[in-house]
Design a protein with these regions (language model features):
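SAM-dependent methyltransferase
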Residues: 20-93
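A short hydrophobic/small-residue beta-strand
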Residues: 19-20, 106
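A short glycine-rich, Lys/Arg-flanked "PGG" loop and its adjoining helix->strand segment in the class I
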Residues: 3-18
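C-terminal lobe and adjacent flexible extensions of AdoMet/dcAdoMet transferase-like proteins
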Residues: 86-130
């Protein structure tokens, strides 16, 4: 539970200490497009010469705000395995509120690790809290 994590962090933070948090900024268009068909997301050659292809399929659940991701691995053109990742999506105003409700002061909110300003096109939500 996110609130339990925030409570543990707050209890371990020294007075004046900083809490850094990064989270994806949900991109609804990307999620919707990802539900339509399996898409190639990576292709590479391993050190031992195997050709690896990764295809992704996503399914977003509105009720739980979980994006269920499947990565289908192909090695040398043959299907090998599936890896699943369930990712809870936290929307910007939601996460801002959760941090404040749990006693954190948001000092900075960036759109990436380069400390660029957070905006509609930001891939990340990077927080510096106290």
């Amino acid at each position: 539970d996110l609130f339990k994590v925030f409570n543990v962090v707050r209890n371990h933070l020294k007075d004046g200490g900083l809490f850094l948090l990064d989270c994806f900024n949900p991109n609804i268009q990307y999620i919707v497009e990802g539900e339509k068909e399996q898409k190639e997301i990576a292709a590479y050659t391993t050190d031992d010469g195997r050709e690896v292809l990764i295809k992704q399929k996503m399914r977003y659940e509105n009720k739980t705000q979980i994006n269920r991701i499947e990565w289908h691995y192909y090695i040398n053109g043959k299907f090998n395995s599936i890896q699943n990742l369930d990712m809870r999506m936290f929307f910007p105003q939601e996460l801002d509120s959760y941090l404040k409700w749990n006693g954190f002061n948001i000092i900075h909110k960036y759109g990436g690790f380069g400390e660029e300003a957070f905006n509609d096109n930001s891939e990340k939500q990077v927080f510096v809290c106290q």
